[in-house]
Swiss-Prot record, chain A:
GO terms (BP aspect): L-leucine biosynthetic process
Pfam families with a match to the protein in the record: Aconitase_C (PF00694)
EC number assigned by the record: 4.2.1.33
The protein's name in its UniProt record: 3-isopropylmalate dehydratase small subunit 2
Gene Ontology MF terms in the entry: 3-isopropylmalate dehydratase activity
Curated annotation (Swiss-Prot), chain B:
Organism of derivation: Thermotoga maritima (strain ATCC 43589 / DSM 3109 / JCM 10099 / NBRC 100826 / MSB8)
EC identifiers of the protein: 4.2.1.33
Enzyme type, top EC level: lyase
InterPro entries the record matches: Acnase/IPM_dHydase_lsu_aba_1/3, Acoase/IPM_deHydtase_lsu_aba, Aconitase_4Fe-4S_BS, Aconitase_4Fe-4S_dom, HAcnase/IPMdehydase_lsu_prok, Homoacnase/IPMdehydase_lsu, IPM_dehydratase_rel_enz, IPMI_cat
Protein name: 3-isopropylmalate dehydratase large subunit 1
Keywords: 4Fe-4S, Amino-acid biosynthesis, Branched-chain amino acid biosynthesis, Iron, Iron-sulfur, Leucine biosynthesis, Lyase, Metal-binding
Positions annotated to bind [4Fe-4S] cluster: C298, C358, C361
Subunit field text: Heterodimer of LeuC and LeuD.
Cofactor note: Binds 1 [4Fe-4S] cluster per subunit.
Length: 166, 418
């Protein structure tokens, strides 16, 4: 897991749903690179095909990823090269899917203090998010203990297999 | 201290008493994926090195784009059928219907833990089962291990008392709940339904309400299992699957909301969020023209939904400018509707009756809208682009409101047609 992430911010609103993140009409494939092209398509058409999104950070409002259970949503975001999603809150299924596929996501109540183009830095290990452009720093709630254990075990499956026994 | 329904069901599946907030490993009774999420689930299953399916009941459903409209999807579906054969997993195919409806008809028992790679798996809550939607990786793990980790959710108690007036239905109750809680008001939590209105409601209506629990962010929408549940299971030819299951009277809830059914009016959810709810009687004044009406889906595609809609349309006729699409939720619903002459009447009225399945709700086929067009649908979700075109508008309402709208051509309160 990358513990320190830095990138340019793209700002989205509240309730960004999975139909906007990856519309069903593009779900002809499970290939991450194909899905990446249409990442955020119905929230911001053409977003997934921009040259400048690699390594960037999506910052959004409440309830990011609500709607369908399609894991293609975090997969598309990750494959598009987005390094992290910061949101005021996440929908439950999206949160789980993102953890399972290794897309770093961070809950930050002050997410709306970011503006498009700001440079953000996320320090997962120390639980800090910085807005380098505005010179601001925020403490974030670390992942729940159980999820940290999953990560320490080297992934969710490894943890589960160990717990369940052979 | 007493238990909520969620705590009861998880305690049974963990093997000890568990409380809200705990993270537990629980065994799963029923797991499934559909043709949107299934191919990815199968890839993960194979990548993780599983050799056999260990969950007691595992199913694959080809319902989202079925029969397939494109060769890429046909190839994914082919792969699902091959996996099903190889692993001994039953595949429900074109013409069989929507996963959640089939599960309710044939398999879900009160107290079951049901995990599906589809967000509306919470429909199973209508039978007193803990149904919840998960991603493909999570379901692949359940296929392989028969269990997964869950956080036992806190519960919001939803009390619905009183009798609904004519023309107001279960769909209006869940839209009212969406209006009150908002689209993330129950995130990570379970809804548990109580009150005289719920007690007097049949399972078909309960399924409609539980189906949309996820639209307020909930992990599950749990109904009690009572005599109404027994009636439904008996009708499905499996009364032996019944057992009574209710929360303890002294269970602890996170919050409680109360709804007076007697004063509830027909409601409609406006684009592009489910919680953007208003009274149909108010919206009607704006004369919002509707191009297409869709009656169907896992929310409202059951026999009684078709009957309610037909009763209005039969009496008043369909507006010539409205395209009416009717989709029975399952093969059984389709057969029952055929036997009762309902399908014939819909066809005579000018409707396009589509094969059982998700139909236009998922935006892949069978009713994709044109730019600037508006649809009123009995489905559960009206996100921008949901039905295949981000430049179209989706309105959500009950089958009665849908039928009344198909009569006039604009969003219409059904009460004056009843």
């Amino acid at each position: 897991m990358v513990v320190k992430i830095k990138g340019k911010v793209f700002v989205f609103g509240d309730n960004v749903n999975t139909d906007e993140i990856i519309p069903a009409r593009y779900l002809n494939t499970s290939d991450p690179q194909e899905l990446a092209k249409y990442c955020m398509e119905d929230a911001r058409p053409g977003f997934g095909r921009r040259d400048d999104i690699k390594g960037s950070i999506i910052v959004a409002g409440e309830n990011f990823g609500c709607g369908s259970s399609r894991e293609h949503a975090p997969v598309a975001i990750k494959a598009a090269g987005i390094s992290c999603v910061i949101a005021k809150s996440f929908a439950r299924i999206f949160f789980r899917n993102a953890i399972n596929i290794g897309l770093p996501i961070v809950e930050l109540k002050e997410a709306d203090e970011f503006e498009e183009g700001d440079i953000a830095e996320v320090d997962l290990e120390n639980g800090v998010v910085r807005n380098l452009t505005k010179g601001k720093e925020y403490r974030i709630r670390p992942y729940p203990e159980f999820l940290m254990k999953i990560m320490e075990a080297g992934g969710w499956l490894e943890y589960c297999l160990k717990e369940v026994g052979e | 201290m007493g238990k909520t329904l969620a705590e009861k069901i998880f305690s049974e599946h963990v093997g000890r008493d568990v409380k809200a907030g705990e993270i537990v490993l629980a065994r799963v009774d029923i797991a499934m994926a559909q043709d949107g999420t299934g191919p990815l689930m199968i890839n993960e299953f194979r990548e993780l090195g599983f050799k056999e399916v260990k969950v007691p009941k595992a199913f694959l459903f080809i319902d989202h784009a079925s029969p397939s409209p494109r060769k890429e999807l046909s190839n994914s579906q082919k792969m699902m059928r091959e996996f099903g054969k190889e692993m001994g997993v039953k595949v429900f195919d074109a013409g069989d219907g929507i996963s959640h409806q089939i599960l309710a008809e044939k398999y879900v028992k009160p107290g079951d833990l049901v995990a599906g790679a589809d967000s509306h798996t919470c429909t199973a809550g209508g039978l007193g089962a803990f149904g919840t939607g998960m991603g493909s990786t999570d379901v692949a793990i359940i296929f392989g291990l028969g269990q997964n980790w869950f956080k036992v959710p806190e519960t919001i108690k939803v009390v619905v008392n009183g009798k609904l007036q004519d023309g107001v239905y279960a769909k209006d109750i869940i839209l009212e709940i969406a209006r009150i809680l908002g689209s993330d008001g129950a995130t990570y939590k379970a809804l548990e339904f109580h009150g005289s209105c719920i007690e007097n409601m049949n399972v078909e209506d309960r399924l409609t309400i539980s189906n949309m629990a996820v639209e307020v962010g909930a992990k599950a929408g749990l109904m009690p299992s009572d005599e109404k549940t027994r009636e439904f299971l008996k009708k499905m030819g499996r009364e032996e699957d019944f057992r009574e299951l209710k929360a303890d009277p002294d269970a602890v809830y996170e919050t409680e909301i109360e709804i007076d059914a007697t004063t509830l009016e027909p409601l409609v959810s406006l684009p592009h969020y489910v919680d953007n709810v208003r009274k149909v009687s108010e919206v009607e004044k704006e004369k919002i023209k509707i191009d297409q009406v869709f009656i169907g889906t896992c929310t409202n595609g059951r026999l009684q939904d078709l009957e309610i809609a037909l009763k209005i349309l039969e009496k008043h006729g369909k507006h010539p400018d409205v395209r009416l699409i009717v989709g029975p939720a399952s093969r059984k619903v389709y057969m029952d509707a055929l036997e009762k002459g309902i399908i014939k009447k819909f066809v005579e009225l000018g409707a396009a009756v589509i094969p059982p399945g998700c139909g236009p709700c998922v935006g892949i086929h069978m009713g994709v809208l044109g730019d600037g067009e508006r649809v009123l649908s009995t489905q559960n979700r009206n996100f921008k682009g949901r039905m295949g075109n981000p430049n179209a508008e989706i309105y959500l309402a009950s089958p009665a409101t849908a039928a009344a709208t198909a009569v006039t051509g604009y969003i219409t309160d059904p009460r004056r047609f009843i």
